[in-house]
């Protein structure tokens, strides 16, 4: 605690036995020795003494981490225990040290030969001494804040007492202004000469754990760090590093029954509280870890222990690569753990599931695999449908077979009323289903391609997928032709004559012309009770959920026109980086032209408007449950159906949540985030809002289903705020260090933060000393001026009030006459110019005070002027000020020989001014 303090704790180098300090008893968890490394063996000549030394004091084995400690009596609470929360959480004191073994002579003498008289004495315990010594403090104390005494084996009670003593010493030194015998505090800004007189010269070798560290301590910490992680990776070779970090968090930060955290051993504590371990060494240190490292190394900024401001030291972390700007990256364990348990909580028990199709492969039940979906290649082809006036089951089967021959990964559309679906293998892409229902004379169940969960509807009983694959049901469809598309994470713009967009994966769009109806349509993503609907069976839409891509659309040219069609005709589109342009041909009401040409934002020109056009529109979808609106328009008096669809996609957080999309034509807008309301079943033309349910994120962005959870949304916002604040703080720190480097260093090479701060402190000290010198000089000059003024005033007061009588001459000259007179006299004798400067203020006062209106008035004012302005107490300060002005404007003090020339120039300028006026 004084100038230089070294604490020595002799112990066994090879055993993990109990280490004992000579003075205080210590808990085991404060041991920071590198016991994982074997110590160097003693010389061969001293092997016997070393074995005797080890056998003299057998040590008990170290208690395991899970062994229970025996109950003991609590210690007495002292006055300083308010500084910690739990002063009694410590291990029992250990047994005393065997001093007989310590004092045993272990020095061995070696001779070089029989004839040589040279010999060498080596202490066998010399290597042990270096392992047991730990540097506690070097130099003098600077701050009285709490000190953990890292490296010293102290109990909580001793740490509290030492910190109280340090605080009391600081109080005595700085508040009571008296020296204390315990420890002495110094501050770099004191400017005292004896700051560094007792400090040992130490080279700055690294930053992070200590400001100034000896190279031996750095090497020792590095060896402990490497040994610890080698052992950890040997135990967890087959596990990912994210689960390893999670296990460490659970091991280090969980609380026991009494609520107090378990002390962390020093071998593991160095991982938690140092920046040096992760960022202060080069990449070659991680060469042994690269084979077991599937992801980036955990960022030390995310370790909660480093959040304490007292534990952070300036390091090189701001210069390391930072992945915080990639907001879409989630914690690594979510990729491997959360996707395994999502569907278990969503799916009902197997008893409630209907029987699957025997022809379906087993992989069809797994909707979303645990890993990211690979891209599926879809051919650039065209699927045409028959143009017959009516659609029967046979034609529906033909459409299904046509779609099946294109790609096995696309779920075919089912148009049959009661025919079982034709299942195809789909091991990769999740399939979303839509069911179009319209009133008819009889109820008809519509089978879906993915029977998972039964719907609670009383009359219509199509099987229902999970929460994020609910069938989208339409209570009724108007005469217009709505085409609903499911997009992933982009904005599709619409056009009356052409619609273009690009995808990374296929997207199946099936358009139908249902029977005319006047009831509004509603779309829900959760099963809702439907009223009994009658009518012929309507086909349902089946489409594939693609990956999030950026889609480019055509410009808004004119509102799409939707003309009611007399007969239902299905149109199936298979898209992969293709352009879709509906065109009108003779004899065929609908055609779809597909090209694989490069897409332009302007779109592709097409022919005139066909009887039925395809309208594709979506809104910008946010990360958390974005909403896509599809608005259709009709040129007739029929109502405009409004449908809303949740899109389980993930885009950047900068997009506006719930953006509305409205087409030209003045159709009513539906808010993107509307509450659940009842849908009117009457035939009135009114848009019906849809019910919404949580939709999951895409599989490649951790299908955790937490996008609509308010807690997760709030946590995400808080995380973004913290990231922004942390980046701003680091940027300010970096800018501050750059400014300091520009101020204190002339060279452009990068210096460490510790050196920068040290030089900055020295620079500030120098500036403060210079400022103090300047302030002292200014104060001295002000005092000298005041002293001179006081002396002059005292001398003037000693002079008599009256002097030599002067004949009063009448001053009736004007200013120009006065200047002319001064000029003429000065040219004769330059000394008159000095006299003119003295009498000029007197002449000005005479002109302003003496009146010549009458003789009596002139006599009275002249006498008054004499009394006020011509007395010696008034003339003396006036003459003094004139002489001061003469001294400051001329060189009478520095070079009196130039005064005649300056007087001539002054009167010449004065004559010019009077002539100009």
From Swiss-Prot:
Keywords: Acetylation, Activator, Cytoplasm, DNA-binding, Membrane, Mitochondrion, Mitochondrion outer membrane, Nucleus, Phosphoprotein, Transcription, Transcription regulation
Pfam families: HLH (PF00010)
Region feature (Required for cytoplasmic localization): 73-327
Positions where Phosphoserine occurs in the chain: 9, 33, 39, 667
Annotated positions of the N-acetylalanine modification: 2
GO cellular component term of the entry, any: nucleus
Domain bHLH: start-end pairs: 717-767
Annotated spans, Transactivation domain: 322-445
Gene Ontology MF annotations: DNA binding; protein dimerization activity
Coiled coil regions in record: none
Region of interest (Disordered), ranges: 1-72, 347-402, 632-711, 897-917
Region (Mediates heterotypic interactions between MLXIP and MLX and is required for cytoplasmic localization): 830-879
Top-level taxon in the UniProt lineage: Eukaryota
Comp. bias intervals (Acidic residues): 27-37
Biased composition (Low complexity): 47-57, 632-643, 686-704
Cellular compartments annotated: Cytoplasm; Nucleus; Mitochondrion outer membrane
Annotated TM spans: none
GO BP of this protein: nucleocytoplasmic transport
Compositional bias per record (Polar residues), positions renumbered to this chain: 378-388, 670-685
Region Leucine-zipper: start-end pairs: 767-788
Functional summary from the UniProt entry: Binds DNA as a heterodimer with MLX/TCFL4 and activates transcription. Binds to the canonical E box sequence 5'-CACGTG-3'. Plays a role in transcriptional activation of glycolytic target genes. Involved in glucose-responsive gene regulation. Regulates transcription in response to changes in cellular carbohydrate abundance such as occurs during fasting to feeding metabolic transition.
Subunit organization: Efficient DNA binding requires dimerization with another bHLH protein. Binds DNA as a homodimer or a heterodimer with MLX/TCFL4.
PANTHER family in alphabetical order: BASIC HELIX-LOOP-HELIX ZIP TRANSCRIPTION FACTOR, MLX-INTERACTING PROTEIN
Name of protein: MLX-interacting protein
Species this chain originates from: Mus musculus
Classification of source organism: Eukaryota, Metazoa, Chordata, Craniata, Vertebrata
